């Protein structure tokens, strides 16, 4: 309902970055475009994932606060690397898998990247609307170049492993399929935790650490998308590269 009270400029500043990234990833899917209904449902599942994550984070925060002082080092490490990271990335992954794992449309390895990024950007879009409604245009502009593409990057890493898991599963290699499904949650959660932990450190020198981390995250994610798009193969199409491993 807060959308009814937001300035159209604020809404545009919030929505446009996510839409831009959605289009870029969609166009990178060179073999076979994904059904629009499926992609829309993934965006909506990303929105729903924010609700699940918020409830888990509230519970986790209350429990953690009863053990450690708020903003102490142990508190922040557990909060960002465990509670926030796994609540958000875990919720995204569960909803992603329930919708796509057995879908007939999931027939190319790069589809995993497309699906995971769409869920992640649905999450980022709704989360961003909430922040911008509270804090205004300056927050929208900052998050447009940090948090929104950050969620997209987490989605790229999730999708790379998710697509590989599907390929291994199709080949009957269930051990590696399970390993990749685990990594599809673990890797983005670790990156997400590092992002939040560095971003909230009060040392002024950490601003440079955060900048380097974000630029490296963006660069590697872009490389993964480009290589994955170029080397994409149909999952049941015989031998082909499992890009990046």
Predicted feature locations:
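Hydrophobic alpha-helical segments at protein termini of multi-pass membrane proteins
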Residues: 1-245
């Amino acid at each position: 309902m807060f959308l009814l009270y937001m300035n159209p400029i604020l809404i545009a500043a919030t929505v446009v970055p996510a839409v831009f990234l959605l289009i870029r990833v969609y166009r990178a899917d060179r073999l076979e475009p994904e059904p629009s209904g499926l992609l829309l449902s993934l965006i909506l599942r990303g929105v729903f994932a924010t609700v699940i994550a918020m409830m888990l984070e509230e519970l986790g925060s209350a429990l953690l606060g009863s053990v450690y002082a708020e903003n102490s080092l142990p508190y922040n490490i557990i909060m960002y690397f465990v509670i926030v990271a796994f609540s958000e990335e875990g919720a995204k992954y569960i909803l992603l898998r329930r919708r796509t794992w057995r879908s007939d449309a999931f027939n190319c390895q790069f589809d995993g990247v497309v699906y995971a990024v769409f869920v992640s950007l649905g999450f980022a879009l709704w989360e961003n609307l909430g922040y911008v409604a509270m804090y205004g245009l300056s927050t929208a502009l900052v998050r447009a170049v940090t948090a929104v593409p950050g969620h997209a990057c987490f989605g790229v890493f999730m999708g790379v492993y998710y697509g590989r898991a599907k390929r291994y599963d199709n080949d009957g290699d269930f051990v590696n399929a399970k390993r990749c499904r685990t990594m599809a949650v673990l890797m983005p959660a670790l990156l997400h935790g590092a992002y939040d932990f560095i971003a909230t450190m009060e040392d002024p020198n950490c601003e440079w650490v955060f900048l380097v981390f974000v630029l490296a995250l963006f660069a590697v994610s872009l490389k993964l998308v480009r290589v994955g798009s170029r080397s994409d193969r149909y999952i049941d199409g015989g031998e082909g590269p499992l890009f990046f491993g």
